[in-house]
């Protein structure tokens, strides 16, 4: 893992030389390496296009930036997803550009509790990631959060059914509103701050990261 000094230097160079989201990917990947046990793998899927090879990574709403997988997972073309294969997805990382304002916990809770008719954009991506991957690191390089969906067999079955319905509907050339099919379902999650400012709280931040269980 990068030292605090190395991380600060890289953040400064990003600001100075190439202020784009993708610059954070290797830094974030380095920070989360200690969370990967011998049985886990991290893969970059942000550049994938929606296809049968990528359906399981797209899930409900989008491709996250990094996914955490069981090492025994093997990707292949799929027109439907079996729950046994889905469970080999252990989590994901959603990275936003440096210092981008992250969606607050209050806004996420309000969206879910009010069952808004439609959700799009970053909110739709984040809630879709949470439901599909169950565990999400959400960061802008300074602020770091860890969202975790409570295990519940009923919602698991619903989510996989909705994704398979999305695949079928889109293959027929039609659009699909996944949120409309899930918004009335009951689910709980936690939203934990790993750090509001990882540079100012480095030691505590590193400690919390190392405690993450995928």
Describe each PLM feature range:
Residues 1-135, 149-214:
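A short, conserved, highly charged catalytic patch centered on acidic carboxylates
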Residues 136-140:
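A structural signal for short, well-ordered beta-strand segments and their strand-loop junctions
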Residues 142-145:
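Loop/turn residues immediately N-terminal
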């Amino acid at each position: 893992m990068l030292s605090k000094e190395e991380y600060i230097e890289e953040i400064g160079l990003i600001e100075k030389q190439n202020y784009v989201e993708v610059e954070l990917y290797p830094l974030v990947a380095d920070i989360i390496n200690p969370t990967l046990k011998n049985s886990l793998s991290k893969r970059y899927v942000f550049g994938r296009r929606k296809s049968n090879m990528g359906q399981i990574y797209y899930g409900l709403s989008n491709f996250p930036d990094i996914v955490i997988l069981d090492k025994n997972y093997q990707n292949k073309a799929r027109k439907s997803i079996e729950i046994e294969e889905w469970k080999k997805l252990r989590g994901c990382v959603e990275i936003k550009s440096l210092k981008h304002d992250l969606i607050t916990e209050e806004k996420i809770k309000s969206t879910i509790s009010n069952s808004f008719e439609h959700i799009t954009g970053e909110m739709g991506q984040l809630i879709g990631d949470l439901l599909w991957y169950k565990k999400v690191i959400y960061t802008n390089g300074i602020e770091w959060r860890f969202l975790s969906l409570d295990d519940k067999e009923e919602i698991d079955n619903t989510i996989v059914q909705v994704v398979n319905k999305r695949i079928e509907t889109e293959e027929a050339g039609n659009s699909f509103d996944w949120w409309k099919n899930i918004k009335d379902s009951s689910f709980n999650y936690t939203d934990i701050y790993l750090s509001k400012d990882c540079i100012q709280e480095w030691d505590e931040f590193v400690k919390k990261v190392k405690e993450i269980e995928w």
